[in-house]
């Protein structure tokens, strides 16, 4: 009896344990598959950027398409060598079909995108192709703004330098003392000296005879006697 009891108990224990082991193995397998999918998805997303309406072909090209409004069909936009080109094509088609409610990959380029002539699939494809081959203007605008800011900064620095130089020159000119004119002072002094002083050389006048045509009476006006020469003789 005891042996039968232990055998039945062991069988029941194995029956209870086997399903649990199978379920554990199944759960472990599902977890491993999920983690592998997440890892693969992470590797795939890290290789290239992900854009709305853009898919990658097996041979490395990028395709873009968009669903027509209120229809099950899609508008084929084309195959492109880069994901950015396909994303710009999708943005043009989305703007044409959905308007302001469209979700864009490059919202900053919305104003520069070409517009289709009509909402027909052919016109949308033409506009999308133009947008795909257009050059992005974000880098150009950023470089232009930086260069303009540098030029404005350099012009401001040059203006400040010119102002400093002009201020220095004005200060140096303010320190110069205005001197009187030499010619004017000379004329005034000479006139005053002419009025105050008279030069008279009596010795020269006595030694040299008077000019021709001048009488001896004229010498009286100068205080010279006509017999001045005779007065110098000595009686021996």
Curated annotation (Swiss-Prot):
DNA-binding region residue numbers:
50-107
Where are the compositionally biased (Basic and acidic residues) regions? 26-47
A Pfam family matched in the record:
AP2
Q: Name one GO cellular component term.
A: nucleus
Show the coiled coil region(s).
none
Q: Which SUPFAM superfamilies match?
A: DNA-binding domain (SSF54171)
Gene3D superfamilies attached to this UniProt entry: AP2/ERF domain (3.30.730.10)
Disulfide bond annotation, renumbered to this chain? none
GO BP annotations, alphabetical order? ethylene-activated signaling pathway; positive regulation of DNA-templated transcription
Primary location recorded for the protein, binned into one broad class: nucleus
Q: Which domain of life is it from?
A: Eukaryota
> A single GO molecular function, which one?
DNA-binding transcription factor activity
Give the residue ranges for region: Disordered.
17-50
Where in or outside the cell is it found?
Nucleus
Q: What does the UniProt keyword field contain?
A: Activator, DNA-binding, Ethylene signaling pathway, Nucleus, Transcription, Transcription regulation
Q: Which SMART domains does this one have?
A: AP2
Its function?
Answer: Probably acts as a transcriptional activator. Binds to the GCC-box pathogenesis-related promoter element. May be involved in the regulation of gene expression by stress factors and by components of stress signal transduction pathways.
The UniProt similarity line reads: Belongs to the AP2/ERF transcription factor family. ERF subfamily.
Record's protein name: Dehydration-responsive element-binding protein 3
Q: Which gene underlies this protein? A: DREB3
């Amino acid at each position: 009896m005891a042996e039968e009891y232990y055998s039945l108990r062991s069988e029941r224990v194995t029956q209870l344990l086997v399903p649990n082991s199978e379920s554990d193995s199944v759960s472990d397998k599902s977890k491993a598959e999920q983690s592998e999918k997440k890892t693969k998805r992470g590797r795939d997303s890290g290789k290239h950027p992900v854009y709305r309406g853009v898919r990658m072909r097996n041979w490395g090209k990028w395709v873009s398409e968009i669903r027509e409004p209120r229809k099950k069909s899609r508008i084929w936009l084309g195959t492109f060598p880069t994901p950015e080109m396909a994303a710009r094509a999708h943005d043009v088609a989305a703007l044409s079909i959905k308007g302001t409610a469209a979700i864009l990959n490059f919202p900053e380029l919305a104003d520069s995108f070409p517009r289709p002539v009509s909402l027909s699939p052919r016109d949308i494809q033409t506009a999308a192709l133009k947008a795909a081959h257009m050059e992005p203007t974000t880098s150009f605008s950023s470089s232009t703004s930086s260069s303009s800011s540098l030029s404005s900064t350099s012009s401001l620095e040059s203006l400040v330098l010119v102002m400093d130089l002009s201020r220095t020159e004005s200060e140096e000119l303010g320190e110069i003392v205005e001197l009187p004119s030499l010619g004017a002072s000379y004329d005034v002094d000479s006139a005053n000296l002419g009025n105050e002083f008279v030069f008279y050389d009596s010795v020269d006048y006595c030694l040299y005879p008077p000019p021709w045509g001048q009488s001896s009476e004229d010498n009286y006006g100068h205080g010279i006697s006509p017999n001045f020469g005779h007065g110098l003789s000595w009686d021996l």
